[in-house]
């Protein structure tokens, strides 16, 4: 085929027409129409004064979401907020690469897939990793956290605040306090919690937190918000060995976004527009009102699930309000249930993986879908799909 003929054949790709889905999975979630509109705004340069202002707006609004400063985005606290150009895994990599030096001891609270991923990143960075392991879905008590850190004397401690693979919410106050008593930094993975449940960065004593945009913030995927405490910033400035990643060097990124605005990389302009709008939507609702809405819908969801005779995987006191893990009933093929929901109702949910593969459904109720009507809609369709696959309700 000639080059001209090949070129003409490429013109036959159809126009994009994504199917309408109800994103009840662990993420990405539904996006507010204003966020879609923001994505369509004209591009400016990544060094343009207007974009510099947009970055500043995003950093200020993130203070509200993380719970640092006054909690209203006024910027009264010295904690830094910034945004990594990449998904939540980029934020994880940035946290590990910048704050866990080669051969330094990192203590990881391991109870799910994403603590395993963090462990792998740290090992590739040359860290000496020690792990406190529990079954997927379990959490760590205050006494367990203190004893582990006291015994290991690490330089850095890491835990998953909201474990996406299990739906378990880990309290961080005892972990962070014990880390500080040991002279260590505390890193928290807030990928599934930010925007949907309180992170309380300052109150908890977190030093470094990272998240993503496509879950609790109800934005499209592509950015990783971070918050960094003053003591972590001091530690970073005093670091003697070079950060092994140039792209994820937070000193360079912070200088570009906050200080001199010298070129570091070409930021994804449209995604910053989208994140700014998503954060404004949250601010207009009120962050505490948003948390309460998610709590209310979570309770309604659990009530409906239990009325079907189904069981939640995580104990009540440790559940994430935005992400539910429901045990698959005996004799039911969870993959067939998920496929039926997608084909017949346009509903997307996720299955488990790792030790939970085939054993749980992972169902997100977050952002625009966290309303009583939407929860009732989901429960009705979920019940129908289960019944069609042989489950008697």
Where are these regions (language model features)?
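Conserved PLP-binding catalytic core of the aspartate aminotransferase-like
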Residues: 311-344
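Active-site C-terminal subdomain of aminotransferase-like
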Residues: 30-31, 214-303, 307
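Conserved PLP-anchoring active-site segment centered on the Schiff-base-forming lysine
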Residues: 100-116
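N-terminal "arm"/small-domain region of PLP-dependent enzymes with the aminotransferase-like
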Residues: 2-49
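PLP-dependent enzyme catalytic core of the Aspartate aminotransferase-like
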Residues: 2, 16, 355, 359-393
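Conserved N-terminal alpha-helix of the aminotransferase class I/II PLP-enzyme fold
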Residues: 38-94, 113, 117-123
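Active-site phosphate-binding strand-loop segment of PLP-dependent enzymes
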Residues: 139-195, 208, 216
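Conserved active-site segment immediately N-terminal to the catalytic lysine
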Residues: 202-214
């Amino acid at each position: 085929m000639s080059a001209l003929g090949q070129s003409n054949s490429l013109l036959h790709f159809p126009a994009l027409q994504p199917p309408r889905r109800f994103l009840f999975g662990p993420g990405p979630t539904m996006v507010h129409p204003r966020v879609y509109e923001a994505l369509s705004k004209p591009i400016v340069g990544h060094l343009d004064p207007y974009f510099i202002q947009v970055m500043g707006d995003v950093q200020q609004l993130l203070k509200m979401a993380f719970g640092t400063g006054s909690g209203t985005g006024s910027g009264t606290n010295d904690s830094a907020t910034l945004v990594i150009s990449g998904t939540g895994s980029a934020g994880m990599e940035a946290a590990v690469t910048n704050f866990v030096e080669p051969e330094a001891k990192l203590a990881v609270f391991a109870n799910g897939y994403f603590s395993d991923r963090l462990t792998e990143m740290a090992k590739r960075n040359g860290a000496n990793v020690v792990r406190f392991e529990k079954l997927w879905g379990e959490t760590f008590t205050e006494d367990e956290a203190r004893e582990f850190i006291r015994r290991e004397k690490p330089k850095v401690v890491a835990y998953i605040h909201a474990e996406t693979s299990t739906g378990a919410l880990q309290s961080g106050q005892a972990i962070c306090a014990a880390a500080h008593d040991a002279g260590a930094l505390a890193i928290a993975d807030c990928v599934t919690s930010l925007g949907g449940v309180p992170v309380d960065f300052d109150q908890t004593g977190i030093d470094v937190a990272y998240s993503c945009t496509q879950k609790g913030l109800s934005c499209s995927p592509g950015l990783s918000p971070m918050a960094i405490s003053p003591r972590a910033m001091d530690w970073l400035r005093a670091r003697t060995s070079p950060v092994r990643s140039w792209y994820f060097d937070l000193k360079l990124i912070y200088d570009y976004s906050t200080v001199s605005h010298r070129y570091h990389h070409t930021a994804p302009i449209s995604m910053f527009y989208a994140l700014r709008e998503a954060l404004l939507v949250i601010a207009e609702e009120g962050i505490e009102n948003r948390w309460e809405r998610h709590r209310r819908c979570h309770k309604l969801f659990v009530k409906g699930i239990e009325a079907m005779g189904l069981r939640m995987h995580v104990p009540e006191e440790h559940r994430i309000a935005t992400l539910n893990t429901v045990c698959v009933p005996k004799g039911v093929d969870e993959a067939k249930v998920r496929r039926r929901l997608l084909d017949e109702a346009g509903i997307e949910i996720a299955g488990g993986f790792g030790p939970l593969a085939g054993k749980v459904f992972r169902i997100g109720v977050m952002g625009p879908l966290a309303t009583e009507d939407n929860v009732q809609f989901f429960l009705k369709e979920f019940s129908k799909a289960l019944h069609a696959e042989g489950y008697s309700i």
